[in-house]
Amino acid sequence: MSGEIRLGALCDHALVGQDGKVSLMGIFRNISVSGLPAQHPRMFLEAILGLDVGAHNVVVRLLRPDGQQSMPNPPEISVHAVAGQDVNVIVELNNMSFTTYGTHKFELTVDGEAVGSLPVSIVQMQPPGERRRAN
């Protein structure tokens, strides 16, 4: 089995139009939080995968900066790859909980084999009066 992430993003909203085109809105890599634990109400993970022809099982896991899994029930998606076409995977993630600062990774596996990851950094929000000034 071979597979790769050809395009991947975390965003506020994702959809596939009738023509098969993927639209992403509000792409981000950082989430600013006032403190921990923090909860992000809604986000979408979008990945365009290049896969071998046939049926596949895609699993999305959230890994903390220490490498430990953070999602108790990772989403599993069954997909079918057709010759000459990429596979669009869109996962809606609601009420994601973060208990540590740092770079987390959404790891994608296809049929049990890691094909790549999408990073998201959880950073502490600075109070308005403490913003850094450029020199």
Annotate each language-model stretch with its function:
Residues 2-135:
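Contiguous segments within soluble domain cores/interaction surfaces
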